[in-house]
Structures are given as C-alpha cells and as structure tokens.
C-alpha cells in the first residue's frame, strides 16, 4: 500500500483507503472516488502542484491538490501499458 503521490504513471491502481477525517472522505466520494475504485496516475508535477488522475471506468480525469493526493492510499493492480 502506497500513497497516490508515490505511485507509478499509467499503471492501474486500486484505492485502498483514505487517510484523513470525515470531510476528506466525503469530498472524495463526491468526486466519485471510493474504495476499490480503479484509477491511473496521469500526471504529477515534480515538486508541487496538482495531481491529475484518470478514472479507468468512466474515462474521465480529475485534478487533485497534492495534499489530498497524499491521503489516498492505493495498490498496484496491473502492469504498465
């Protein structure tokens, strides 16, 4: 289990847990992100800035702040494309 920030690009990831309180969980659920959801890390800046993830099931992209992305714990479920 690793943080979304540490995950490799273009690799299917399963959301395992959200580190944080009820507010962060509610916000991520409102964005359509929940446990066991499959996503891919699409883009991440080297030092700071937003993280872009792709929802594999709906083929949509979501931009998250780096602080929120650090609170999303994922596991790798497949090989790179």
Residue ranges and their predicted role:
Residues 23-27:
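Short alpha-helix capping/helix-loop boundary micro-motifs
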Residues 20-21, 37, 43-48, 60:
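Short, charged beta-turn/beta-strand-edge "cap" motif at the junction between a beta-strand
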Residues 52-81:
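C-terminal structural segments of small proteins and small subunits
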Residues 8, 45-46, 55-57:
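A generic beta-sheet turn/junction motif
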Residues 15-18:
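PDZ/PDZ-like domain segments forming the peptide/carboxylate-binding groove
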């Amino acid at each position: 289990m690793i943080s979304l920030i540490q995950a490799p690009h273009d690799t299917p990831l399963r959301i395992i847990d959200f580190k944080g309180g009820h507010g962060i969980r509610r916000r991520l659920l409102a964005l359509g992100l929940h446990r066991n959801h499959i996503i891919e890390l699409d883009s991440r800046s080297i030092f700071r800035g937003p993280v872009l993830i792709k929802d594999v099931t709906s083929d949509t992209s979501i931009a998250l702040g780096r602080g929120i992305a650090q609170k999303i714990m994922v596991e790798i479920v497949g090989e790179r494309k």
